[in-house]
UniProtKB/Swiss-Prot annotation:
This is DNA gyrase subunit B. SUPFAM superfamilies: ATPase domain of HSP90 chaperone/DNA topoisomerase II/histidine kinase, Ribosomal protein S5 domain 2-like, Type II DNA topoisomerase. Pfam families: DNA_gyraseB, DNA_gyraseB_C, HATPase_c, Toprim. The record marks K486, N489 as: Interaction with DNA. The keyword Signal does not apply. It is an enzyme of class 5 (isomerase). CDD domains: HATPase_GyrB-like, TopoII_Trans_DNA_gyrase. GO terms for molecular function: ATP binding; DNA binding; DNA negative supercoiling activity; metal ion binding. PROSITE patterns: TOPOISOMERASE_II (PS00177), TOPRIM (PS50880). Its cofactor is Mg(2+); Mn(2+); Ca(2+). Belongs to the type II topoisomerase GyrB family. Few gyrases are as efficient as E.coli at forming negative supercoils. Not all organisms have 2 type II topoisomerases; in organisms with a single type II topoisomerase this enzyme also has to decatenate newly replicated chromosomes. HAMAP family: GyrB.
Length: 677
């Protein structure tokens, strides 16, 4: 890629920048530009800068991006692209100043003569927003035969300085997020790693290096995530490394196979039912699509869509075109080859996509994203374009691979049979309307409020805890659903078995939304769904089973932020002549104990510190005061920032592959933080 850098420096020059407005609005309302000022918004700063570097790679000017999380709280992103222009802009300022200080000053806003045909990150917008939300930003540019440097103090530019002569080109940006704006300025290595890995999958041949320099010598990890790992290091190299004063956590992402490697990665904990990965693409005026796909023996669909490398969590027209073509092609093939009788009803999309792992990546010159977060592609013309490409290519593949095609069709037919067998169970669940929970006597203790926005459903493990929760709740807005029997592991069961499970029926009926294609979020009866289980291993297992059910059957509940985990306390500190205190961790227990003793309090001798083994040990008053009272409780919202990572996690934890699960647990045994999946 780098060797093929185009000599079109002028096309991405001062004239390609169109200034629209300044940055003051960004600091006043940062959430409008980066989604939030929490952890997600903080990481969004990195994505915006990295997206610009990836734009250079997509345009054919760069083949390497280096990201460093530094010890002083800053992040540095470097690429070997053309470098941000430094020539004087029409406004009288250097172009780099315009890019860094004016909103919507990106190259792509100049129309046909702009720097990029296709762009993922809001080039210029993103960097200026990052600048606006940083206390300091430094940019080093190699371009026009020289090195250039510029710094910004709270978005105010210093002087652009020309440095030494150089033959290389590229841009390095380093920024310090403003702690007055963000709730936290602590970056999560795994969050960054997952996103960068995704970008490497989507840009075949691009190398992305991630280095975390915050770690200590004891935390060294040097992992090359690639089909072609580096050669083993010699004894001399190892000795030199160990003598180095500061070691870092490092990962390299490089995928020569692109989307094919992505599908291999998704299916690596599953059992593919055909060997070859289906891989094809197509180009049209202003559009480009690439798709890789492979079926596995599981029961869940795992389709991930991207537009201009942006993860379109909510799908859009590219996914609609793919689904339509796939359903049509498989049904036609099945009928033509007599794998499905003429009198048989057509296979549904759900039947066909059972066990399908697929990645759909489109590049669109003028994308229309629905919603501020850009997670759904809205271009209507993309649907027919993708549909046409998929129809042609999938038809050709099925005809050319009859043995694999038969296995795929037979799996879909088997899924259809299970669906038909499940219809009665599904209708039974549907008939038990949200107001008349026939067949579920005494289970759901509903709330008096009929406003879903104010209503909460606590799904509680066990009858004893359910009893305490019913007694301790505020019945105006809190409903309680105690679970008595075992929740089925939906990762290992088809829908007909899942819907026969009494506890699953109770949950689906109480929520009121339906499942899969029949899911309707407007019918949700509670806008907060709180999973409340014991803080021990068994409780965590129950929570994981419930999360797997919601993820596989009612994923929009998680996507829209309706699912929460209650955080019951682990300890109760009983003081003499003082009210008891509750601790939610060992550290908090120690802190409360130390503070209380310093304040002259005395702890009860025999049972001063009580460790709760389960929710059932708490009476109704304690449960309300610690876990259910909205003014004091701690709820953890379950998020879905990375559907592919969540999909993989559920497959590992709840699937058939024992070795993968053992390996995962061994690797993560020391990390006791809950995984926000």
């Amino acid at each position: 890629m780098a060797a093929q850098k185009k000599k079109a420096q002028d096309e991405y020059g001062a004239s390609a920048i169109t200034v629209l407005e300044g940055l003051e609005a960004v600091r006043k309302r940062p959430g409008m530009y980066i989604g939030s000022t929490g952890e997600r918004g903080l990481h969004h700063l990195i994505w915006e800068v990295v997206d610009n570097s990836v734009d250079e790679a997509m345009a054919g000017y760069a083949d390497r991006v280096d990201v460093r999380i530094l010890d002083d709280g800053s992040v540095e992103v470097a690429d070997n692209g053309r470098g941000i222009p430094v020539a004087m802009h029409a406004t009288g300022a250097p172009t780099v100043d315009v890019v860094m200080t004016q909103l919507h000053a990106g190259g792509k806003f100049g129309g046909e003569n702009s720097g990029y045909n296709v762009s993922g990150g809001l080039h210029g917008v993103g960097v200026s927003v990052v600048n606006a939300l940083s206390t300091r930003l430094e940019v080093n540019i190699a371009r026009d035969g020289y090195e250039w440097s510029q710094y910004y103090d709270h978005a105010v530019p210093g002087t652009l300085k020309q440095g030494e002569a150089t033959k290389r080109t590229g841009t390095t940006i380093r920024f310090w997020a403003d702690p007055d704006i963000f709730e936290t300025t602590e970056y999560d290595f795994e969050t960054v790693a997952r996103r960068l890995q995704e970008m490497a999958f989507l840009n075949k041949g691009l190398t992305i290096n991630l280095t975390d320099e915050r770690v200590t010598n004891e935390e060294v990890v040097d992992e090359v995530v690639s089909d072609t790992a580096d050669a083993p290091k010699s004894a001399q190299e190892k000795a030199a490394e160990s003598a180095a004063p500061h070691k870092v956590k490092h990962r390299t992402f490089h995928y020569p196979g692109g989307l094919v490697d992505f599908v291999k990665h998704i299916n690596r904990t599953k059992n593919p039912i055909h060997q070859s990965i289906i891989d094809f693409g197509g180009k049209g005026p202003g559009h480009e699509v690439e798709i890789a796909m492979q079926w596995n023996g599981g029961y869940s669909e795992s389709v991930h869509t991207f537009a201009n490398t942006i993860n379109t969590h909510e799908g859009g027209t590219h996914e609609e075109g793919f689904r339509s073509a796939l359903t049509s092609v498989v049904n036609k093939y099945a009928k033509d080859k007599k794998l499905l009788k003429d009198k048989d009803p057509n296979l549904t999309g759900d039947d066909i996509r059972e066990g399908l792992a697929a990645v759909i990546s489109v590049k669109v010159s003028e994308p229309q994203f629905e919603g501020q977060t850009k997670t759904k592609l809205g271009n209507t013309e993309v649907k027919s374009f993708v549909q046409k490409v998929c129809n042609e290519q999938l038809t050709h593949w099925f005809e050319a691979n009859p043995a694999d095609a038969k296995v795929i069709v037979n799996k879909a037919v088997s899924s259809a049979q299970a669906r038909i067998a499940a219809r009665k169970a599904r209708e039974l669940v549907r008939r038990k309307s949200a107001t008349d929970l026939g067949g579920l006597p005494g289970k759901l203790a509903d709330c008096r409020s009929t406003d879903p926005r104010k209503s909460e459903l606590y799904v509680v493990e066990g009858d004893s805890a359910g009893g305490s929760a019913k007694s301790g709740r505020d019945s105006m807005f809190q409903a309680i659903l105690p679970l008595r029997g075992k929740i089925i592991n939906v990762e290992k069961a088809r829908i007909d078995r899942v819907l026969k499970n009494t506890e699953v029926q109770a949950i689906i009926t109480a929520l009121g939304t339906g499942i899969h294609d029949e899911f309707d979020i407007t019918k949700l009866r509670y806008h907060k769904i709180v999973l409340m289980a014991d803080a021990d291993v068994d409780g965590q297992h129950i929570s994981t089973l419930l999360l797997t059910l919601l993820f596989r059957f009612m994923r929009p509940l998680i996507e829209h932020g309706h699912v929460f985990l209650a955080q019951p306390p682990l300890y109760k500190l009983k003081w003499q002549r003082s009210d008891p205190e509750f601790a939610y961790s060992d550290r908090e227990r120690d802190g409360l104990l130390e503070a209380g003793l310093k304040a002259g309090k005395k702890i009860n001798k025999d049972d001063g510190i009580q460790r709760y083994k389960g929710l059932g040990e708490m009476d109704a008053k304690e449960l309300w005061e610690t876990t259910m009272d909205p003014t004091v409780r701690v709820l953890r919202q379950v998020t879905l920032d990375d559907a592919a990572a969540a999909d993989e996690l559920f497959s590992i934890l709840m699937g058939e592959d024992v070795d993968a699960r053992r390996s995962f647990i061994t690797r993560n045994a020391k990390d006791v933080r809950f995984l926000d999946v």
